[in-house]
From Swiss-Prot:
Feature: compositional bias, Low complexity: 28-51
Protein name: Inner capsid protein VP3
Coiled-coil intervals: none
Gene3D superfamilies associated with the record: Inner capsid protein lambda-1 (3.90.1830.10)
Subcellular localization: Virion
Gene name for this UniProt entry: S3
Residue ranges covered by zinc fingers (C2H2-type): 117-140
Key word Amino-acid biosynthesis present: no
Main subcellular localisation: virion
Compositionally skewed regions (Polar residues) per UniProt: 8-18
Family: Belongs to the turreted BTV-fold inner capsid family.
CDD domains assigned to the protein according to its UniProt record, in alphabetical order: lambda-1 (cd11674)
Length: 1214
């Protein structure tokens, strides 16, 4: 009801003169909105302001209610009645004492005829009542309640509509903007699958490590001639030429993967490549950890593999006009012409007889350039071209396997048409306007097992970061608002309830109060859409009624705002995905009826006055809610009826289909390509829409409001709430019940269609568990992830030692905003659903965004398998995988060490495929990352466990990584790693010295005669009387230092000080020989002029000084520079040499001369070039994993990668 003018402490004996003051003609009146039912009250407001009465002094108990009342008769005249002294006395007696600071407020506000008449709707002013009436009839004829609504109601309406004014930002008018933004974001979030390279397919550079020296004049002149004319030699011509690992050094085209393995030649240290993990913080810059060598080699090889995930792109072929290869088709390298000589070394003719010339003279001309295959087929460029050029076998193997991965993801365009039609619920017509070509590659497919694995990873990632689930709901909510024809129009509600008349003597206006409570909390206009979006992710996100929206549990049912809140909670409850929502709304009313209708709760520590929001576990559901028959209908009739109402009318879930069987299904706990839905649903009418009154939502709204009408008219209310207020409340509820809203129709027919289509294209597929509703034992209490194979651990999915529990991140929603959406949904009267959705859904299928989820699922599988393998290979016992690197040393990793390895693999994949967001992040953030397998399960309150085992499918990248690991063990010298052990033996010589390729038998071996093994601590035993100290051997027996000793590397690390002080001097003296058992180690080479004397001791002493228990530096070796002609050499003293041959990275020496007179003598090995020089070579074969060949046949591809709208035409089906 409208609040009348009020005064504080009005005198009961006011002077008559005070009530007869007439304002001057045309005196201005207040500009504030009128607050009374009579037009002349505007003048009264002005006089009230002059009297000094402020709004805080007015209210239901103020004297204003006992002031002379006014009314308007049929003729428009003012009737004035004097105030009764008795009424004034009662008012003063019931009013709390207050101190009035302004003496003017003690005056009686004069009530007189107004100088103008104000419209209650628009505040327009008129000089006569007839003019005002004409204005109302003409300008506000469509406002049904204009003449009935009071100014207070109009003010409440304006405030309500102002609060909801922001809803226009959710209007579908900006749908194209939202769709474009989402689709662009979805495409940007996709992995970078396509990286093409038109350069050379090689990761190893032939480098002149030591430049040529002491060349003859003829050779000097020839070298100058080539340099002068910028002629690139096909092969290096230095004194020492080595094969150096340097990925993508000859690439041309797209940018790389962001990961490169570029090792320096062995003359420089490369320890940085072997300290990626388990090294930071305690390993010096110049050291590596031999006990973590396997894990670091794994990570280095993974980066090597990922950096080469490219497609060998074909380029322009031209005819070669040189003499030897005349007529051969060779490629042109636009932008890097120097690659031409390197690509086809067999074309070169060297005029001087050198090692390179001898090798190139054996080249087979038919092994150069394109092989016999048509470049054009039917007028179209062929999908692939086979050619022979510089190409190392390992890089080729990686790239060919990656092409196989992309081909396994290829989606045939004819299938894409079917996929689009099924995903769009046949609301679109799609056709293929172009001819199908073999060059088309559409890597958009993922199997169901890949999608299911990705869903488990989503659960793992979100369980460690619940905030990550909320953007999924926001994104789908935005898409829903962009495609839906449903518009929320709050004026529907205001027009309905303002037809209800209110008495002007009511101290509380029910209409104003309900409009105040229905204002959106925190401007959350999208609560309704968030609820719908959360249904698709109810396994990750649970929408719950906001705690602020619950009535205060200390209030009673007679507190009308609390009763309204209870009504709104009940109406909005089924829209949430909270399985405890029914009991919460029941307890909200039970809180208000705690005194008149007590019921048993039956849970220790829980009472009927316990806040309803705390009933969020099936174990605390009241017995009366579970079985309404337990509530005595005489003692608690309303609660009994309320429980029965919830049991009878709470909507039951249903399901519908979505997606396409050709796209696979990511569902874990729901049948494939099905979505569960919390309301009953019906097919979409394709031609017409109309309000429905028999749907589940219509029934819920109608029966809920009918129940609360019963509450309003119950004995508990009639005793304290006056009849006028109850009549108004009943009228308001009846009006709300009769509102013609389209929301129930939308929920039953249109929303399932929207969710079905949008769920098919979102980046993150729906993650759902069944809606359990009112069955206590079926309520899901936990959704869990297990990291072991269920076949090994039957209870894995519910074992808290192996799992992390998370049943959805809570997303509070405002019930008031949901109620407004339920009552105020509108659509165009002439809406044709199929036509609308055809236009709305078409943009969704105009880009590749719908396939982003599939691409990410494949990368998730590849990353997971590689991460699991990397961790397992660093364990002594764990998941069974092939272990090619088992010979490398590695301590058994702990959970923390495994997490570091997992992080490194995860970061490598995210960098290589340019991925944002989480990939495998959650696996390393909690629990034990030493994974055997993944399974997901949910636990129900009744004890039932539903478990889904999700083993990953075969991984192409992992298979390639295993081949790379096997090749590393055979060709580790190319990565600056040596095998075998280190001898420290004094060797003085003037002759040749080749420490990396010993030719003689080893001086001694473990277990040989008189060979001792040092004890585990390398302890020294001093002796008296000038006797030499002794070493404790592995039998704990002191032995003389002189002789042959075996030092395990870990013993050397912990006793390096003893070694330097006692053992090393004996080695330099030639009295002791030491075998350091390293197994595998990083090394460096130091080349020197053999004509200058050299003592290797200072270099080794520097190396020994940097050894500590945490790590060792690269082992240094000294090698004389190979000489072209005989020379007089100086005497040199060497100590260090390897026990095995480690010279595989040596490509050639003195390649620009015919021979080497002194030093290492190596010519170009034909074994690395069978494709060029071996007549028995079979095209397409290689020597992996035993040897990396440098010249091979390969396919170069002419793929095209169309977008979805580039191969298909989409239009509305109507």
């Amino acid at each position: 009801m409208p609040r009348r003018s009020a005064r504080k402490a009005q005198s009961a004996t006011a002077s008559p003169a005070d009530t007869n003051v007439v304002p001057a003609k045309d005196a201005p009146t207040t500009n504030s909105p009128p607050s009374t039912t009579s037009p002349n009250q505007a003048a009264a407001d002005a006089n009230q302001q002059q009297a000094g009465i402020v709004s805080s002094q007015s209210g239901p108990n103020a004297v204003g209610d006992s002031a002379p009342s006014t009314s308007v008769n049929n003729d428009g005249d003012i009737i004035t009645r004097p105030t009764s002294d008795s009424i004034a006395a009662v008012a003063n007696a019931t009013k709390p004492a207050a101190v009035v600071s302004d003496p003017q407020s003690m005056k009686v506000t004069p009530i007189v005829n107004p100088s103008s008449y104000v419209c209650n709707v628009c505040n327009a002013r008129f000089s006569t009542m007839s003019a005002l009436s004409e204005h109302l009839r003409s300008d506000h004829r469509d406002d049904a309640s204009t003449l009935l609504a009071t100014p207070m109601i109009n003010n409440a309406i304006r405030s309500f509509l102002t609060a909801w004014d922001g809803i226009r930002i959710l209007s579908p008018d900006v749908s194209s903007k939202h769709l474009s933004a989402y689709l662009d974001s979805a495409v940007a979030n996709g992995p970078e699958l396509i990286v093409e390279d038109t350069g050379l397919c090689t990761s190893f550079m032939l480098l002149d490590n030591i430049p040529s020296a002491h060349l003859t004049k003829e050779l000097i002149g020839f070298t100058w001639f080539m340099q002068m004319y910028q002629m690139t030699p096909p092969l290096p011509e230095g004194a020492v030429n080595r094969i150096v690992c340097m990925t993508n050094w000859a690439s041309l085209g797209d940018e790389g993967r962001g990961l490169e393995v570029r090792l320096p030649p062995p003359t420089d240290s490369s320890v940085h490549a072997y300290k990626t993990v388990l090294s930071r913080g305690y390993i010096d810059n110049a050291q590596f950890n031999p006990l973590a060598l396997r894990s670091n080699v794994l990570l280095m090889l993974l980066q090597f593999t990922l950096s080469n995930l490219k497609i060998n792109k074909s380029s322009t072929f031209t005819s070669d006009v040189t003499t030897i290869t005349s007529g051969r088709m060779i490629r042109a390298f636009e932008g890097r012409p120097e690659l031409l000589a390197l690509a086809y070394p067999g074309r070169a003719v060297l005029p001087t007889q050198t090692k390179n010339a001898q090798f190139l003279s054996t080249a087979i001309a038919d092994r150069i350039g394109r092989l016999d295959r048509a470049n054009l087929i039917g007028g179209e460029v062929s999908a692939m071209v086979e050619c022979m050029e510089l190409c190392d076998a390992l890089t080729l193997h990686i790239r060919e396997t990656y092409v196989m991965l992309l081909r396994s993801m290829h989606q045939d365009p004819t299938q894409i048409v079917q996929i689009v039609n099924e995903c769009a619920n046949n609301l679109l017509n799609s056709t293929i306007p172009i001819s199908l070509r073999p060059t088309i590659l559409c890597p958009w497919f993922a199997s169901s097992e890949d999608l299911r694995l990705q869903q488990v990873m989503h659960l793992v990632n979100i369980s460690s970061n619940t905030a990550a689930a909320l953007p999924l709901v926001e994104a789908l909510s935005t898409l829903l608002r962009s495609v839906t024809p449903l518009v929320l129009d709050p004026t529907v509600l205001t027009n309905a309830i303002t037809t209800i008349s209110e008495s002007t003597t009511q101290t509380i206006s029910p209409i104003s109060e309900i409009l105040r409570l229905l204002q959106p909390m925190g401007n959350d206009y999208a609560a309704f859409w968030k609820c719908i979006a959360s249904w698709a992710y109810n396994g990750l996100v649970t929408t719950v009624l906001s705690e602020d929206a619950f009535p205060d549990s200390s209030q009673s049912i007679t507190h009308l705002p609390s009763m309204w809140k209870c009504l709104f909670l009940t109406l909005a409850g089924p829209m949430t995905s909270d399985p405890h929502s029914p009991v919460k709304v029941f307890m909200a009313l039970a809180n208000l009826l705690a005194q008149p209708e007590p019921i048993a709760i039956g849970v220790p520590g829980m009472h009927q006055t316990t806040p309803a929001s705390q009933f969020s576990h099936p174990g605390v559901w009241p017995p009366g809610f579970l079985n309404p028959q337990l509530i005595n209908p005489q003692q608690a009739p309303l609660l009994r009826a309320f429980a029965e109402h919830i049991r009878a009318n709470w909507p039951q879930p249903s399901e519908f289909g979505y997606g396409s069987t050709l796209q696979g299904s990511a569902n874990l706990f729901i049948p494939p390509n099905r979505m569960v839905y919390p309301w009953p649903n019906q097919p979409l009418p394709r031609l017409t829409v109309a309000p429905t009154y028999d749907s589940a939502m219509s029934n819920w709204i109608s029966t809920t409001i009918a129940f609360f009408i019963r509450v309003v008219n119950s004995v508990n209310m009639t005793a304290t709430v006056n009849d006028l207020t109850r009549r108004t409340m009943t009228g308001v509820m009846t009006a709300m019940r009769q509102v013609k809203t389209m929301t129930p129709f939308y929920i039953q027919h249109m929303c399932p269609t929207e969710l079905s289509v949008l769920a098919s294209v979102t980046v993150t597929p729906p993650f759902q568990v069944p809606f359990t509703r009112l069955v206590q034992n079926d309520v899901i209490t936990n959704v869990l992830v297990a990291r072991v194979d269920p076949a090994q651990r039957g209870d894995a999915a519910v074992d808290i030692r192996a799992t992390h529990a998370t049943f959805a991140a809570a997303l509070p929603v405002d019930p008031a905003a949901i109620v407004v959406a339920m009552l105020c949904g509108q659509t165009e009267t002439n809406l044709i659903p199929s036509h609308h959705y055809g236009k709305a859904f078409a943009p969704l299928f105009a880009s590749n965004a719908m396939f982003t989820r599939n691409q990410r699922a494949v990368i998730t599988r590849e990353a997971f398998v590689c991460a699991r393998s990397a961790v397992a290979q660093c364990q002594d016992a764990g998941f069974l995988v092939p272990r090619p690197l088992d010979a490398l040393r590695q301590f058994d990793v702990t959970s923390a060490a495994a997490a570091e390895i997992m992080h490194a693999v995860n970061d490598a994949f995210k960098t290589a495929f340019d991925l944002d967001g989480a990939l495998l992040d959650g696996l390393a953030l909690y629990g034990d990352p030493r994974i055997a397998d993944l399974s997901a399960a949910y636990l129900q309150y009744g004890g039932n466990v539903v478990r889904e085992h999700v083993p990953p499918g075969p991984s192409h990248i992992h298979r390639t990584l295993q081949q790379v690991e096997s090749t590393f063990m055979a060709e580790m010298n190319l990565f600056n790693v040596a095998r075998g052990n280190l001898y420290l033996v004094q060797t003085a010589t003037n002759g040749n010295w080749s420490p990396m390729a010993p030719v003689a038998a080893p001086p001694f071996v473990r277990g040989g005669p008189n060979v001792r093994v040092v004890g585990r601590f390398g302890t020294i035993v001093p002796r008296p009387d000038g006797l030499e100290p002794q070493l404790i051997d592995d039998g704990n027996v002191p032995r003389d230092i002189a002789g042959d000793w075996v030092y395990p590397s870990d013993v050397l690390q912990v006793s390096v000080a003893v070694f330097c002080d006692y053992v090393w001097p004996m080695v330099k003296a030639g009295r002791t020989r030491v075998l350091v058992e390293l197994g595998h180690y990083v090394y460096t080479l130091h080349y020197y002029d053999p004509q200058i004397s050299l003592d290797e001791a200072p270099i080794l002493e520097e190396w020994l000084s940097k050894i500590n228990p945490a790590g060792i530096p690269p082992v240094p070796f000294c090698i004389p520079i190979p000489q072209v002609y005989p020379c007089i050499t100086a005497r040199r003293v060497h100590y260090a040499f390897t026990s095995e041959n480690n010279n595989d990275s040596l490509f050639s020496t003195n390649a620009a001369s015919i021979d080497t007179a002194f030093g290492e003598n190596a010519a170009v090995s034909p074994l690395r070039w069978p494709g060029l020089v071996d007549p028995n070579y079979r095209v397409g074969t290689n020597d992996l994993p035993n040897r990396i060949t440098l010249y091979n046949s390969l396919y170069r591809y002419n793929f095209t990668y169309p977008t979805l709208d580039g191969i298909m035409y989409v239009r509305s089906a109507t």
